[in-house]
Amino acid sequence: MTENIHKHRILILDFGSQYTQLVARRVRELGVYCELWAWDVTEAQIRDFNPSGIILSGGPESTTEENSPRAPQYVFEAGVPVFGVCYGMQTMAMQLGGHVEASNEREFGYAQVEVVNDSALVRGIEDALTADGKPLLDVWMSHGDKVTAIPSDFITVASTESCPFAIMANEEKRFYGVQFHPEVTHTRQGMRMLERFVRDICQCEALWTPAKIIDDAVARIREQVGDDKVILGLSGGVDSSVTAMLLHRAIGKNLTCVFVDNGLLRLNEAEQVLDMFGDHFGLNIVHVPAEDRFLSALAGENDPEAKRKIIGRVFVEVFDEEALKLEDVKWLAQGTIYPDVIESAASATGKAHVIKSHHNVGGLPKEMKMGLVEPLKELFKDEVRKIGLELGLPYDMLYRHPFPGPGLGVRVLGEVKKEYCDLLRRVDAIFIEELRKADLYDKVSQAFTVFLPVRSVGVMGDGRKYDWVVSLRAVETIDFMTAHWAHLPYDFLGRVSNRIINEVNGISRVVYDISGKPPATIEWE
C-alpha cells in the first residue's frame, strides 16, 4: 500500500495573474501537493477537494469594478488558513469588510516593507533591520489598487510609505494578505513566507517528493490498466520519455512504444533514442522509419502553418497504422502534463479552467476503442524532469533545450528537403557542441540553428561558390513568453562560424539572430 501523497493539499484559486502557475510550482517545491482552479468554484467543489489551506492568487482586474472576480464566500467559512496574494489580498479585504481604492500611483517593481506587528507569517524573517530594530523585507510589488482600510478583526503587519497595508493578518482565523508577490525570486524571503504558510500554518507534511510520486504513479497505472496492453508514441522528448519509463516500471512488457522517425530529428537522435530505451532500458520499441513519407508530403509546401499540419497529420496516420498492427491493445498513453490540463479549455466565463484530455497523438481510428493513460497530468515540467532523474534518465537528455514538435520542419525555412535537413543537422550539432565546450549551454535558455533558403557567394581557395546561409539563434528567458537574444562572446561566435563553413560542405555564410521577443518569436516559423 503506497503512502497517500495527496493527503495534505493546498487549493490555489486563480484570478488571472501571470504568476499563478509559479505559485503552484513553489508550493510543490515545498513538497506539498496543490491544484490550481478558477476563482468561480462552488462550495461543493471546495468541500470535495478538502484543502489544508487556500491561496488566492493575484490578478489583472480591479476589485473596485462592479463585476470583478470574488472568492467564493465559503473560502472564509471553511475553517482552513487563507493566504491572499496581491489581488487575492484585495478581494479578501473587501469581502470581509475592508476597503479598496484605485491608487494614484501604480506600484510596480522592487519595494521595501517594514514589519510593524508580530505575525506567524513573517516571524523571524527579515532582509534587514531599521535603525530602531524593526525587520525590513525586500519584495516585488505589482498593483494599481490598494487596501485603504483592513477588516476590523485584522491587524497591520507591514507597510511601506505608499502602501499602508502591505501585509495584513487575522491570526485567530489564520487569514493573511500580502500586497506583493512572494512567489517571484525578486521577493527575497518569499519562499520562506510560503513555507511558513504551507508547512507551519497549514501544517502540511512534505509528502510530494520524486520517489513518492513515482511509487504513487506506478500504483495508479497498475490499478488503472491491470494486465492490459498499452501503446505510447515515444518521441525522445522529456514528457514521452518519462511517461515511457513510468509505464515500463509499472507494467513492463505490456507497454509497446512506437517511435516514428520522421527525418526531421536532430543528428543521430533516432539512434540515441533506440539505443537508450531499447538496448539500455529494455523497453519494447517499434521503430518506424518514415522519412520518405514525411518529406514527400511536405514537398512543394512553403507555408509554416501548413507544414505543421502536414507533419501532424502524417504522424497520426503512421501511428494509427502501427497501432492497428498490435493485438489486444486497450490503452493509449500520453505525456500530458499539468500546464496542458490547466490551459486546455476555458469555460463560458472565459476564466475557469476545464480539465480535459490533450490528445497529443491525435485521433485514433474509430475502430480502436482505447482508454487514456496520462501518468504525468498532475505534474509541472520541472517535476517531470526530477522524476526522470529518479528513474535513471540522463541529465543531459532531460535538461536539453526545447525542440519543436515538427522538428526541423519549422527550422528549415520554406520548402523542406532532405538535403537541407542533413545540412542543418550537422550545423546544429556543431553549435550545440561548442556551447557545451565553452560552458555556455546551460547559461542560455534555448539555442539552435535555422536554414535559410537563400544562396550567398563565398570564396573557397581560388574559386567562388554560391552556397546556403544558416542563422544561429540563442536566447535568454525565464518563461519563454518574452526573451532577450543572448550576448554570446564574439570569439565564440567566430569559432562556431569557422567550424560550420569549413566542416559543412554547402554552407557559405553564418549569421547571428539578434532579435528579441517581442517583436520576433523565438522560432523563425
From Swiss-Prot:
Residue intervals of the Glutamine amidotransferase type-1 domain: 9-207
Pfam families registered for this protein in UniProt: GATase, GMP_synt_C, NAD_synthase
Reaction(s) the record says it catalyses: XMP + L-glutamine + ATP + H2O = GMP + L-glutamate + AMP + diphosphate + 2 H(+)
EC number annotated for this UniProt entry: 6.3.5.2
Sorted UniProt keywords: ATP-binding, Glutamine amidotransferase, GMP biosynthesis, Ligase, Nucleotide-binding, Purine biosynthesis
Domain GMPS ATP-PPase: 208-400
Domain of life: Bacteria
Record-level Gene Ontology MF annotations: ATP binding; GMP synthase activity
Gene3D superfamilies: 3.30.300.10, 3.40.50.880, HUPs (3.40.50.620)
Residues at which ATP binds: S235, G236, G237, V238, D239, S240, S241
Top enzyme category: ligase
InterPro entries with a match to the protein in the record: Class_I_gatase-like, GATASE, GMP_synth_C, GMP_synth_GATase, GMP_synthase, GMPS_ATP_PPase_dom, NAD/GMP_synthase, Rossmann-like_a/b/a_fold
Active-site residues, record numbering mapped to chain: C86 (nucleophile), H181, E183
Any one GO CC term of the record: cytosol
Known pathway: Purine metabolism; GMP biosynthesis; GMP from XMP (L-Gln route): step 1/1
Described purpose of this protein according to its UniProt entry: Catalyzes the synthesis of GMP from XMP.
Known partners and oligomeric status: Homodimer.
Protein name as annotated: GMP synthase [glutamine-hydrolyzing]
Source organism of the structure: Shigella dysenteriae serotype 1 (strain Sd197)
